[in-house]
UniProtKB/Swiss-Prot annotation:
Residues binding chlorophyll b 4, per UniProt: 179
Main localisation: plastid
Lineage of the species this protein comes from: Eukaryota, Viridiplantae, Streptophyta, Embryophyta, Tracheophyta
Cofactor binding mode and count: Binds at least 14 chlorophylls (8 Chl-a and 6 Chl-b) and carotenoids such as lutein and neoxanthin.
Coiled-coil parts of chain: none
Example GO molecular function: chlorophyll binding
Subcellular location: Plastid, Chloroplast thylakoid membrane
InterPro entries reported for this sequence: Chloro_AB-bd_pln (IPR001344), Chloroa_b-bind (IPR022796)
Domain of life: Eukaryota
Residues annotated to bind chlorophyll a 3: 140, 150, 216
Name this polypeptide is given: Chlorophyll a-b binding protein AB10, chloroplastic
Protein's organism: Malus domestica (Apple)
Length: 268
């Protein structure tokens, strides 16, 4: 809603009513409504004695049991729910670094989670491209035949892990270098959101863009937990994600995280 935003604006700018009403010719009814609303908001702000940062309606991470907000968490950035028990965001430089790491890792985790699940779904539907299990597909680089991208030897036939790492460092280094350096001409204003990629026009509206930032971070945090779960499943069960899910749904008591971890023997 736009009402809270209007309240904050008038609280921060007491002369706003005068500046708006002075150039225009308002009828007595409109003038009375504007002045009355303005003084009502100013009176409420003076009575509550709160700053503009507390005029928002942020959701707390534990609801009414969350306690007080840390003074340095003002709600300026997406995904801020007032949770920082370790004080990791107390210093602005550390907070900026951790925030950048979280956003970048979130995007990588979302892409990785999709890359782990999608080939398995295609394989189940009979549209597989070679090895569908993500950790087995990557391990093919160490086999005698090497690794075929998309299961097609006529595309990219990789046989050297060093060549793959070198290619990734060059490609990702160029992209990250452009982002961190804010472009060759300084055209990038925010390294976390460099822009120039919005073919669907999703970020044209300011409020919609702010909401998408929150959704990106929420889904990114879930994706990071998902990838951690994928790593543990691969080490413990040596099965793909869909097979693990089918085993769990088929016999939940015998196939769950606790039973797999307790029966896990490293090296076997």
């Amino acid at each position: 809603m736009y009402i809270p935003r209007l309240s904050v604006s008038i609280c921060l700018h007491p002369l706003l009513i005068y500046k708006i009403a002075k150039p225009s010719k308002l009828n007595p009814i409109s003038s009375t409504l504007i002045v009355t609303a303005g003084f009502t908001m100013l009176k409420h702000a003076a009575k509550s004695k709160v700053s503009s940062s507390t005029c928002d309606r942020r959701v707390k991470y534990l609801g009414p049991f969350s306690g007080e907000w840390p003074s340095y968490l003002t709600g300026e950035f997406p995904g801020d729910y007032g949770w920082d028990t370790a004080g990791l965001s107390a210093y602005p430089e550390t907070f900026a670094k951790n925030r950048e790491l979280e956003v970048i890792h979130s995007r990588c985790a979302m892409s990785a989670a999709l890359g782990c699940i999608f080939p398995e779904l295609l394989s189940v539907m009979g549209q597989g491209f070679g090895e569908a299990v993500w950790f087995k597909a990557g391990a093919q680089i160490f086999s005698e035949g090497g690794l075929d991208y998309l299961g097609n030897p006529s595309l990219v036939h990789a046989q050297s892990i060093l060549a793959i790492w070198t290619t990734k460092v060059i490609l990702m280094g160029a992209v990250e270098g452009y982002r961190i350096a804010r472009g060759p001409l300084g055209e990038v204003t925010d390294p976390l959101y460099p822009g120039s990629f919005d073919s669907l026009g999703l970020a044209e509206d300011t409020e919609a863009f702010a909401e998408l930032k929150v959704k990106e971070l929420k889904n990114g945090r879930l994706a990071m937990f998902s990838m951690f779960g994928f790593f543990v499943q691969a080490i413990v069960s040596r099965k793909d994600r869909l097979e693990n899910l089918a085993d769990h749904l088929g016999w939940t008591v015998n196939n769950n995280a606790l039973s797999n971890v307790t029966n896990f023997v490293p090296g076997n």
